[in-house]
Amino acid sequence: MFGAMLRYLIGISFFADSRFPWATLTINLLGSFLLAWLTSYVFKKVRLSPHLSTAIGTGFVGSFTTFSTLSVETISLFQDGHNFLAMVYVLVSLLGGLTMSHLGFKVSKEVQKS
């Protein structure tokens, strides 16, 4: 619930007037980094119960990010004739999400070394 509210606030605060779904893209990329970093560093450093870790990871971060909105926005771009933008959006979302997850794991390893 809190993740979804934060997603909504970011969307209306920074990207309200954009035709391109910058809000969802930004949120999903941040969420990919955050979930990787939380699971590979924070949850190992801070002793939390498995239930609380799951609540934070899949509850907060899961509701912050959104695959369903990405899907609907992609279809809307296609329906509005923005085929190239739709394909770029999907590719950047997928490759960017994987890159940000990788970066989250990498940052975690670097922080653990120091």
From Swiss-Prot:
GO molecular function, one term: fluoride channel activity
Keywords: Cell membrane, Ion channel, Ion transport, Membrane, Metal-binding, Sodium, Transmembrane, Transmembrane helix, Transport
Subcellular location as annotated: Cell membrane
UniProt binding sites for Na(+): 62, 65
Catalytic activity, as annotated: fluoride(in) = fluoride(out)
TM annotation in the entry: 23-43, 52-72, 84-104
Domain of life of the organism encoding this protein: Bacteria
Bilayer disposition of the protein: Multi-pass membrane protein
Any one cellular-component term (Gene Ontology): plasma membrane
Family stated for the protein in its record: Belongs to the fluoride channel Fluc/FEX (TC 1.A.43) family.
PANTHER family: FLUORIDE EXPORT PROTEIN 1-RELATED
Record function comment: Fluoride-specific ion channel. Important for reducing fluoride concentration in the cell, thus reducing its toxicity.
Protein name (Swiss-Prot/TrEMBL): Fluoride-specific ion channel FluC 1
Originating species: Desulfitobacterium hafniense (strain Y51)
Gene that this sequence comes from: fluC1
